[in-house]
Amino acid sequence: EAIIAAGAGKPHPEITIDPDSDFAIFYTSGSTGAPKGAVLTQRGAVTTVLSYAMLGAAVKVANGGEDYFGENPGILVSVPLFHCTGSHAVFMMSLLAGRKMVLMRKWDAGDAVNLIQAEKLTDKVGVPTMSHELTLEAERRGEVLETLQSMGTGGAKRPEAHVEKINEVFPQAWSSSGYGLTETNALGTYNGLHDYQSKPGSCGRPIPAVTDVKTVREDGTDADVGEPGE
């Protein structure tokens, strides 16, 4: 609030940004396990945020026009902001949507349950281990966490048994999974709503509107539907 008040009524600075200029360098383990710096562009970051916004609008339509998060959305930030999930999907999307962020110093399932309760948070994003530990801790304490509406995951495949447990402990919440690359500003695929419930092992569909995905054989030719590839 102090930051907003300090700039209230002041004109925005006149600056020109090259859309293809560097935005950030994020490090990715890639295929070899050795960290490699991926240079992200301004255009790539903005495209990702707009793509997530389009995805959110599509999810709202699929839900009959009802907004899952209500008038006071809030997210538990338990992932680092130097990673695409924390930077793009959590931080920048929160700025765009006016969503409250509550940051954790380090991950602890008990603290997470307490913060969701105290801050009335609606959203939690993290790796599958985090969402599972949160679910088990809430179950142990007999907590439903009524305000929690979304349990998103990425970074690894969430076991199907985890999805069933989330449905059991948090019947009011919906779970989802996303896949992306650091080099693509986290854009990739998304699996949510009824698709996720029917096929939780799937990586989902390409995120609109600029994502194209194809699977190729070892010789680089396109693989057929149902054929293993990369």
Predicted regions and their residues:
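Conserved pre-ATP/AMP-binding loop-to-beta segment of ANL
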Residues: 8-27, 34, 64-74
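Conserved S/T- and glycine-rich ATP-binding loop of Class I adenylate-forming
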Residues: 22, 28-31, 75, 81, ...
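Conserved AMP-binding A3 loop
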Residues: 23-51
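Gly/Ser/Thr-rich phosphate-binding loop
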Residues: 96, 118-126, 135-198, 208-212, ...
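Conserved AMP-binding/adenylation subdomain of ANL enzymes
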Residues: 46-74, 82-122, 137
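Short beta-strand->loop structural element characteristic of the AMP-binding/adenylate-forming
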Residues: 36-39, 77, 99-106, 176
